[in-house]
Amino acid sequence: MIQSFTRLNVADNSGAKEIMCIKVLGGSHKRYASVGSVIVASVKKAIPNGKVKRGQVVKAVVVRTKKEIQRKNGSLVRFDDNAAVILDAKKDPVGTRIFGPVSREVRYANFMKIISLAPELYNEKRNQKK
């Protein structure tokens, strides 16, 4: 559950290290963002010579949350941190690498470029008897 003033880690190599959510996109009074939601954020910490600078306002998609997500099969998925990937105007990632696992819900939000760059897609496999 991401809301205004929530600080998130950045899971790509765009140059930003930490961002702060300004607004959750997708409705006039949408309060919370979950995995796969697009937010408007401000860069709070950045490395020198990065693609984005400190204080810059960017759009980002949430890829991990501490708040658990309930899947259709009944399982709950949660992560150790809140993380996002910074997007450009065409909703493609600014960075060329993604760090850490990415939740499967990002695929349902049609961010296929992020899925293809992710080193690990958190995809729970249930034990099924044959």
Curated annotation (Swiss-Prot):
Please provide, in alphabetical order, the Gene Ontology terms of the cellular component aspect for this entry: cytosolic large ribosomal subunit
Q: Which Pfam families match?
A: Ribosomal_L14
Q: Which GO terms describe its biological process?
A: translation
Return the InterPro entries for the record: Ribosomal_uL14, Ribosomal_uL14_bac-type, Ribosomal_uL14_CS, Ribosomal_uL14_sf
Q: Where are the transmembrane segments?
A: none
Print the keywords alphabetically. Answer: Ribonucleoprotein, Ribosomal protein, RNA-binding, rRNA-binding
Is Cell inner membrane among the key words of this record?
no
**Which family, according to the similarity comment?**
Belongs to the universal ribosomal protein uL14 family.
Function recorded in the entry: Binds to 23S rRNA. Forms part of two intersubunit bridges in the 70S ribosome.
Q: What's the protein name? A: Large ribosomal subunit protein uL14
Organism of this sequence: Helicobacter pylori (strain P12)
